[in-house]
């Protein structure tokens, strides 16, 4: 049965793909694959038959998912933002992925707020981020907007490498992300000016990276993906380019950040015990500790102890402690062990024994932790995990392959992806019972219908409440959305026939329809979780804001560039006037004095007018040129000014 279902789904998929191609034929250009991570993001492209992971402007292949706003009003994204976290913690935003698609009341949001250095406020039952964007201006951003800024950075990284505009992308999400989180991620893409052609699950993308070139018959692959903020386990069968997800499980709130947090809390307590001082009051000190703890954690993957040294940590005092691997493991042992539960669950759901697993693929930076590797190995009775792929880049690699498929690249071969919905979907029926329509681990895309009726006589309206989760009662599950079907003709209870249809698309996003079979009256809802989801108007406003930000960034850069040009020119002249071997030795004392005075004047003006606008900087440079050039022309006759002044200075970027 299962095989024929798969074959049918395959035919359906290939059929729809072809039909879509016939319909579309639009040129989507180069489609990029983006791994939008909690702590780091990565972008890849399928080019000339292979995947290229693209380095950012700092030369790094992964980019911190950080956005910062400086007091001068500059917006920094990526490495530059992360590097100034300790000096500007209140306005440096990270971990947006832990807030995206969640409600304000979500216990995990409430837990996170305690440890985030920036302000998180409630707006329309959602967590919004409040920062000072410079010039004493406060602004609130939805988590989608912060994620959009990171996506924009990845888009620009790809554009710089490709030398052309990028408009279409495949973006990855944790397999265990629910409907609201997937929709919100798609919205973030829209705000960043990207058409997100497909949302794919991270472990599935990693499996593509692992199995793209494996052609030796059917294999069972277990992907264990533990990143900075989320954890997924997926079990797939790979068979000559067909990747079928059999089961998936995980925790969308478990990762390296939680391990860091445990260590930080340990040291904060220790410091209080030793000095009586509570560091938590000082945001900067806590962020300095965060930075050093993360460094120490990485070091402990290859050594048994690491020193944590922080100069002027708190109230001028230094911090110096040792963290051993054993202590790190002890502080996190319950979290490490909890990663085995989803592994067990996935095996149960797919009716497989441990010995049936052919390969274990470790993905995500946190799988470098020796204890995690040891626990996985012990769970699988000593079986060594596969070491063939880069845990940081595998997800973006797989996304880039899928992007290649969607852009019609012939070199990707016959790649077919069959993914599943991670959670059971259903509706509430009398007594608050969860009536399941689509069980978890059903292959998507899928469509299921069921007939329901009214609960009381002459009931004119039925309210359809859509839930996801595994518990028998809806109160224990997650409400996705609600809608009404009205205009039901008066009839005794149980007589009207109401057909409810659930349809999940390839992105794992759900659409629900209800139809009164008697009247043909229909109502539908794309589950966009109205309280949770941005409205089209909000998205449009955010798109405009994002464009405005890009414009402001450009203006700011232009202002800095013109300021630097004036500064370089002035200092270049100052150095030449002072050099007796060069210009200084050739000028008459009168001309020298005129030039020195003009140069000093401009340097002083610069020091007191850091915030002047572009026109002012240009005007001051012109004034200086008008004084200097006649003197230099006189000196050199008609040979023109010496080449080492303005032209050379203007060509050099100041550091």
UniProtKB/Swiss-Prot annotation:
Residues annotated with O-AMP-threonine modification: 519
Omega-N-methylarginine: residues carrying this PTM: 493
InterPro entries membership: ATPase_NBD (IPR043129), BIP_NBD (IPR042050), Heat_shock_70_CS (IPR018181), HSP70_C_sf (IPR029048), HSP70_peptide-bd_sf (IPR029047), Hsp_70_fam (IPR013126)
Chain residue numbers at which the record places covalent cross-link Glycyl lysine isopeptide (Lys-Gly) (interchain with G-Cter in SUMO2): 353
Localization in the cell: Endoplasmic reticulum lumen; Melanosome; Cytoplasm; Cell surface
Residue span of region Required for interaction with ELAPOR1: 1-81
Region forming the signal peptide: 1-19
Span(s) of short sequence motif Prevents secretion from ER: 652-655
Pfam annotation, one family: HSP70
Biased composition (Acidic residues): 645-655
Modified residues (N6,N6,N6-trimethyllysine): 586
GO-annotated cellular components: cell surface; COP9 signalosome; cytoplasm; cytosol; endoplasmic reticulum chaperone complex; endoplasmic reticulum lumen; endoplasmic reticulum membrane; endoplasmic reticulum-Golgi intermediate compartment
Cross-link (Glycyl lysine isopeptide (Lys-Gly) (interchain with G-Cter in SUMO1)): 354
Sites of Phosphoserine modification: 87
Disulfide bonds: none
Key words of the record: Acetylation, ATP-binding, Chaperone, Cytoplasm, Endoplasmic reticulum, Hydrolase, Isopeptide bond, Methylation, Nitration, Nucleotide-binding, Phosphoprotein, Signal, Ubl conjugation
Residues where N6,N6-dimethyllysine is found: 586
Modified residues (3'-nitrotyrosine): 161
Main location as per UniProt: endoplasmic reticulum
Reaction(s) catalysed (UniProt annotation): ATP + H2O = ADP + phosphate + H(+)
UniProt cross-references to NCBIfam families, sorted A to Z: PRK00290.1
Protein function: Endoplasmic reticulum chaperone that plays a key role in protein folding and quality control in the endoplasmic reticulum lumen. Involved in the correct folding of proteins and degradation of misfolded proteins via its interaction with DNAJC10/ERdj5, probably to facilitate the release of DNAJC10/ERdj5 from its substrate. Acts as a key repressor of the EIF2AK3/PERK and ERN1/IRE1-mediated unfolded protein response (UPR).
Family: Belongs to the heat shock protein 70 family.
Name of this protein: Endoplasmic reticulum chaperone BiP
Organism for this UniProt entry: Bos taurus
Lineage, top ranks: Eukaryota, Metazoa, Chordata, Craniata, Vertebrata
């Amino acid at each position: 049965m299962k095989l024929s279902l798969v074959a049918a789904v395959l035919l359906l998929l290939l059929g729809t793909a072809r039909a879509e191609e016939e319909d579309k034929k639009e040129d989507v250009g180069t489609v990029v694959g983006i791994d939008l991570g909690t702590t780091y993001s990565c972008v890849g492209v399928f080019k000339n038959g292979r995947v290229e992971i693209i380095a950012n402007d700092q030369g790094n292949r992964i980019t911190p998912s950080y956005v910062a706003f400086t007091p001068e009003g500059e917006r920094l994204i990526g490495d530059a933002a992360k590097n100034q976290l300790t000096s500007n913690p209140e306005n440096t935003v990270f971990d947006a992925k832990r807030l995206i698609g969640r409600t304000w009341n979500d216990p995990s949001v409430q837990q996170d707020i305690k440890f985030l250095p920036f302000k998180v406020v409630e707006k329309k039952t959602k967590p919004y981020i409040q920062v000072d964007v410079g010039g004493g201006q406060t602004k609130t951003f939805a988590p989608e907007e912060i994620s959009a800024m990171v996506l924009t950075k990845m888009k620009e990284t790809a554009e710089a490498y490709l030398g052309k505009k990028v408009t279409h992308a495949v973006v990855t999400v944790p397999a265990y992300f629910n409907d609201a989180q997937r929709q919100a991620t798609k919205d973030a893409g829209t705000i960043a000016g990207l058409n997100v052609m497909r949302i794919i699950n991270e472990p599935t993308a990693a499996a593509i990276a692992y199995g793209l070139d494996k052609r030796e018959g059917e294999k069972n692959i277990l992907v264990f993906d533990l990143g900075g903020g989320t954890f997924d386990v997926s079990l797939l069968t790979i068979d000559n380019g067909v990747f079928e997800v059999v089961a998936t499980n995980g925790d969308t709130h478990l990762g390296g950040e939680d391990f860091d947090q445990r260590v930080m809390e340990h040291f904060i307590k220790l410091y209080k015990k030793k000095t009586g001082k509570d560091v938590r009051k000082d945001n900067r000190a806590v962020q300095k500790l965060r930075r050093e703890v993360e460094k120490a954690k990485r070091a402990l993957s290859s050594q048994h102890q690491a020193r944590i040294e922080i100069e002027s940590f708190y109230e001028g005092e230094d911090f110096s402690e040792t963290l051993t691997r054993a202590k790190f493991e002890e502080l996190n042992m319950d979290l490490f062990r909890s990663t085995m539960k989803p592994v067990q669950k996935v095996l149960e759901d797919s009716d497989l024994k441990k010995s049936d697993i052919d390969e274990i693929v470790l993905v995500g930076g946190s799988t470098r932790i020796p204890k995690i590797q040891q626990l996985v190995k012990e769970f699988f009775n000593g079986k060594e995990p596969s070491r063939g792929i880069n845990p940081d880049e595998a997800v973006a690699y797989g996304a880039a392959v899928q992007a290649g498929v969607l852009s019609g690249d012939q070199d990707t071969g016959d790649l077919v992806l069959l993914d599943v919905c991670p959670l059971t979907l259903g509706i509430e029926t009398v007594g608050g019972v969860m009536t399941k329509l689509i069980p978890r681990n059903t292959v998507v895309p899928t469509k299921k219908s069921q007939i329901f009726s009214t609960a009381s006589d002459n009931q004119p309206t039925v309210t359809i409440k859509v839930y996801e989760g595994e518990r028998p009662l809806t109160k224990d599950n997650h409400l996705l959305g609600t809608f009404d079907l009205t205009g039901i003709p008066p009839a005794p209870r149980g007589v009207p026939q109401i057909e409810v249809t659930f349809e999940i698309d390839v992105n794992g996003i759900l659409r629900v329809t209800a139809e009164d079979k008697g009247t043909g009256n229909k109502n539908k809802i794309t589950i966009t979780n109205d309280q949770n989801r941005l409205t089209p108007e909000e998205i449009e406003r955010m798109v405009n804001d994002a464009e405005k930000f890009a414009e402001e960034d450009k203006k700011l850069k232009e202002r800095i560039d013109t300021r630097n040009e004036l500064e370089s020119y002035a200092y270049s002249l100052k150095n030449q006037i002072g050099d007796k071997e060069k210009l200084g030795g050739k000028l008459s004392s009168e001309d020298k004095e005129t030039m020195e005075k003009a140069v000093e004047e401009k340097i002083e003006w610069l020091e007191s007018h850091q915030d002047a606008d572009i026109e002012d900087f240009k005007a001051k440079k012109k004034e200086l040129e008008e004084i200097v050039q006649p003197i230099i022309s006189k000196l050199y006759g008609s040979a023109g000014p010496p080449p080492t002044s303005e032209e050379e200075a203007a060509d050099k970027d100041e550091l």
